[in-house]
Amino acid sequence: MISAMFDGFYGQAIAFVSPAIAKDWSLPTSAFGPIFSIGLVGLIIGAVAIAPLGDRTNRRVVAILAATAIAVFTLATAFVRTPSQLAGMRLLTGIGLGTLMPILVTITNAAAPEGRKGLFVTLLVTAFPFGAFAGGMLATWGLQRGTWHDVFIYSGLLAAAFPLLFWKFLWAGPPARATGHASGGSITVFSLFRERRWFGTLCLWVVFFASLLNTYMLGAWLPLLLERGGMPSFQAIRIAAEFSLGGTLGGVALGLAASRFGPWVLAGAYLAGAVALVGIGAVGSAYWPVLLLTIFVGAMIPGGNVGNNVFAARFYPDAMNATGVGWAQGLGRVGCVTGPALVGVAVANGMSNPGIFAFSSACAVIGSLAAVGLAVIRVSQPAIPSDRVRLN
């Protein structure tokens, strides 16, 4: 859970310190679009290219190496002096984080007792938005007492403990050859489309894409968009942190509800979040309405992403779990890259805040429709055991 918290913290740290970096380096707001996105490219590389190695080798070793990379490159971020150096550290740290999260979800799902798998995966993934909330608080504290460099020094030193903790306590999970994968052979992305899994795999990818696009787009740009709309900086940062807190609270509820009632819960959550996003664009810079709507959006969309992971971890056989979760998260991270980059283009071209939030709302509606597709699959397979949703 602690490492998942750090994933959320690092994902938000650059957003919270970006105004300070922009002032220090005399950068325009639009310059942060590529910087936000390059770290997410690293998340994609880690999730789809490296995390699946856990299904073929040793998940514990892969996790330790990923955690080591995270610690080294986070600490190095504190000492960058140019935007290109910052982007490079974001890319390398993102590769480590993208590798680590699918491995942790897979190990947690395998280690949890039957009947409690959804609970344990929920607790793990819920740590992500809580880490983002804690990151906002730490960034505010660090910037009041020092510089943006200090924020990355503190987080890098914290991350240095993870490889040691993993070496001592992390369970590797069962080897792939012990899980009895029916089709035999090596596990590849094409395995995710066999045995009638193709439609569910596509729906999972769309749900992850839409959910993570909104989560990272809002997480990265919310402070700057609110400041752009006339809100004081300290209020904008506080609201952005509460967005992540809403994700934590909603994640617990939606993760457990999705485990029990299925993807219909996610469909409703994303639709409700879409309505609230339109509301944020409509109320402008009024602090309390924006705060309450932002917390609600956080509960519905980043919170819904917890349910995505709970469902994904139970959708595939154990032998291909890291591959399935990794590709779902990896394709979702494409949304992470696309969202911040598109907002950067929109801001540079003068699009209004209501227009940007309307686009975000449309993406949430797409995620809701994909969740309906997952729910239809589940309804059409009444004989599937409750502890694993499979299409074979």
Map each language-model feature to its residues.
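Extracytoplasmic
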Residues: 1-29, 218-223
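Extracytoplasmic gate region of multi-pass secondary transporters
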Residues: 14-15, 197-251
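Helix-breaking motifs and short loop linkers at transmembrane-helix boundaries and internal kinks
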Residues: 26, 58, 79-85, 283-285
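Conserved MFS/SLC helix-loop-helix module at the cytosolic interface between two early adjacent transmembrane helices
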Residues: 45-81
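Cytoplasmic helix-loop-helix junction between adjacent transmembrane helices
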Residues: 89-126
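Helix-loop-helix hairpin linking two adjacent transmembrane segments in secondary transporters
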Residues: 114, 123-170
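C-terminal membrane-cytosol helix-exit motif in multi-pass small-molecule transporters
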Residues: 158-178, 367-375
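C-terminal transmembrane helical hairpin of 12-TM major facilitator-type secondary transporters
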Residues: 258-311
